[in-house]
Amino acid sequence: MEKIFTLIVILREELVSIAVLAFLLSYCFRTQRTSRDNSFIRICMFALLHAFLDALALITVNNSAFVPALVNGILQKLLYISAIMCINEIFTYVHAIAFFKKKTKNVRIASYVLVGLAALFIILFKGSYNNVNGIIYGGGIPLMVSYGVGIFYQISTILLLIIKYREVGESFCRIMIPVRSEEHTSELQS
């Protein structure tokens, strides 16, 4: 019983994220959708995938006696790639709003090339594991690549929101700038 409670405490952020994202997705699928809604659904699905993989990776890496190292390694790499894919979708969404879909195709292609290169680095390099207060987390070069690309996209998104403030819309910027800044700060702290 104690192990289950400890697991719930460890996974509390992931469980809340999964519940909220699942609720938002179910709401979106039940209502009429616009192209903006479809973009939100893509972002939400990548975020849900990332939260699910985060929970699964935490469970498997902390039970390495029962889970093969290969499975842990694959889950960690998928976790990092899903994070990059999610922030890439947010960036391309904000870019499309800021430039009224002008030049978005080239930016989207370039962003997918960056995601592909980052995924290649993540796949090629071996990760490591860190024990922090009795909880094992992934680390190493794949994590650094994921954080580096994520921080690049965070800063790019914040700059787009600031530079294209009027085009994007004041209310959208009032929501997104603090959210992007908070996520960027939490990435730097980890």
Where are these regions (language model features)?
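Extracellular-loop-to-transmembrane junctions of the mid-late helices
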Residues: 2-17, 118-160
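Hydrophobic alpha-helical transmembrane segments of multi-pass membrane proteins
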Residues: 10-92, 109-127, 177-186
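Alpha-helical transmembrane segments in multipass membrane proteins, preferentially the mid-helix core
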Residues: 21-27, 89-93, 127, 147-170
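Membrane-interfacial segments
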Residues: 32, 65, 95-102, 165-172, ...
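Interfacial "cap-and-anchor" motif at the non-cytosolic start of specific transmembrane alpha-helices
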Residues: 159-186, 190
